[in-house]
Amino acid sequence: MTDLSKYRNIGIFAHVDAGKTTTTERILKLTGKIHKIGDTHDGSTTTDFMEQEAERGITIQSAAVSCFWNDHRLNVIDTPGHVDFTVEVYRSLKVLDGGIGVFCGSGGVEPQSETNWRYANESEVSRLIFVNKLDRMGADFFSVVDQVKKVLGATPLVMTLPIGREEDFVGVVDVLNRQAFVWDDSGLPENYEIQDIPADMVDDVEAYREELVETAVEQDDDLMEAYMEGQEPSIEELKRCIRKGTRDLAFFPTFCGSAYKNKGIQLILDAVVDYLPAPNEVEPQPLTDKDTGEETGEVATVSADEPFRALAFKIMDDRFGALTFVRIYSGKLNKGDTVLNSATGKTERIGRMVEMQADERNELTSAQAGDIIAIVGMKNVQTGHTLCDVKHECTLEPMIFPVPVISIAVAPKDKGGSEKMGIAIGKMVAEDPSFQVETDEETGETILKGMGELHLDIKVDILKRTYGVDLVVGQPQVAYRETITQAIEDSYTHKKQSGGSGQFGKIDYRIKPGEAGTGFTFSSTVVGGNVPKEFWPAVEKGFASMMETGPLAGFPVLDVEVELFDGGFHAVDSSAIAFEIAAKGAFRQSMPKAGAQLLEPIMKVDVFTPEDHVGDVIGDLNRRRGMIKDQQAGLTGVRIKGDVPLSEMFGYIGTLRTMTSGRGQFSMEFSHYAPCPNSVAEEVIAKAKEEKAAK
């Protein structure tokens, strides 16, 4: 069996354009996985292998690539940096043991870097920091280090320092080993010399080394005591302390370089091996109860000797067929084995297993705990499903995905395209849990739902190019919701007599606003049997089914509490169906009385703008009903954070680019639902009524 201490499962994540994919390419080149280096500038990289990715120069899917460095196996996942694809970042963090956060030397800590950093903190993933693009105009390593402290609240441990600035950037100083690495102009990563530290940098290097040593020895009380008494720790002792501090998230070893110019990548690879944890050094994944989702107290111990347990974290349909990416947490998996999908209760036989090299694949006959592999041709497996030993059923902690906030109606251009479109969308939904589809029951339209405009643009693009389905695309629609604002007590009787046995159900109930985010909650405090206990679930079912369509404009209803406290029944005519119908009638009767209100999705918006356009940008956000929450002046411009209704953000990127001469950037993610102003609500309700009348 392969020694688990020689495994590293790592992710590379950052803001769009910080250089993640280029960094991954350079890692693959250095580890001998590719011979000609791809380049995002011309759309030829190994991990960006979808047409849409190559064309837009952004990474959409997390491609998994295996490679080797210093006798260690590195499974590298290149994650997308655009906020519409954060679900991919979240998904990959779930299966990683460590990561590299890439920051742009001139852009610094940009909006998406902050979101990804927050996700990684929540997942407790150990990270290295790579400050990239130091050959760029305006690049400043020390300023980015400062931003990491101030904006992310993190402790960077400076491991390398840049030699030269901007176009004169020629190499880096390894602070720990007091060595200078200088590359020639050939652009080849292997063409470097180890030299003495430049004379004008010696004092700076010593100051940073002292800080490095002081921070590192805090991880070992005995070593710290010896250091205080004047004993210099050895390189090996320091490495051990840095490894421990990195694993415990006490600090983040920080490196610098230029991936595009092939400078500084070797030191990052050495650091991955030296400081990031092996699979058996991270907290094992908890096992959960299949029905409640609560942790059982058991864990999936990372060992090849345990029963088989794995998590399916990505489904992909490519030119090779259906691929299910899995991270194996425990046990071994051999070709021909039968495994249980604990989510469906069905078993599947493992046909082909492959190790992915981005768009290439190597056939495998077996895999073990710590491996990230793809299984070919699995049926009925979705993202987040647990695969396990047939004799040892278990469920790993499931993945939770954000709710889509934007939708569009689509239809095939030609009549014969419906079936083709349905099959294609089915595959795409299996691949991306944040992308959803539903059919409008009244119009029969197919509605696609996603995380943002770019997300849906790409999906429509994939349908056209990958699956050959030409579409007619409607206007984006906002996912409004409805709720109530007042608590009321009410009563409703359902009575029907038409020969034979009739229907009778009477309910007395209280209906009131619930806590934000609770959805629908139901309770019964009936005493004395006026509504027999066997009918309570029918009352709950009736109310719950009506939550799908609110009374104002037909949007789903949020955050309502219903308490059944009394009622009446008939020994012959009462039935579950009668009480269910009574609850539906009660909902229709009481919602308007309880002050029904329209809610709209509010987005957390993060805008970067050059300083001379701040006034324009803030004025524009105010016109969009935005609430400015924070403003931070940075190196190259100003970050503005605020809450803005989604309905006001369509087409914003175009406006922002015009206002800032193409230099502005923004990201947004769903924050919460808030009441619509009356003028907006009236417009939305009127439009919904018009559409209903037209149907």
From Swiss-Prot:
CDD domains associated with the record: EF-G, EFG_III, EFG_mtEFG1_IV, EFG_mtEFG_C, EFG_mtEFG_II
Single annotated GO MF: GTP binding
Residues annotated as binding GTP: 14-21, 78-82, 132-135
NCBIfam families found in the cross-reference section: EF-G (TIGR00484), PRK12740.1-5 (NF009381), small_GTP (TIGR00231)
UniProt family annotation: Belongs to the TRAFAC class translation factor GTPase superfamily. Classic translation factor GTPase family. EF-G/EF-2 subfamily.
Purpose of the protein: Catalyzes the GTP-dependent ribosomal translocation step during translation elongation. During this step, the ribosome changes from the pre-translocational (PRE) to the post-translocational (POST) state as the newly formed A-site-bound peptidyl-tRNA and P-site-bound deacylated tRNA move to the P and E sites, respectively. Catalyzes the coordinated movement of the two tRNA molecules, the mRNA and conformational changes in the ribosome.
The name this protein goes by in its record: Elongation factor G 2
Source organism of this protein record: Aliivibrio fischeri (strain ATCC 700601 / ES114) (Vibrio fischeri)
Gene for this chain: fusA2
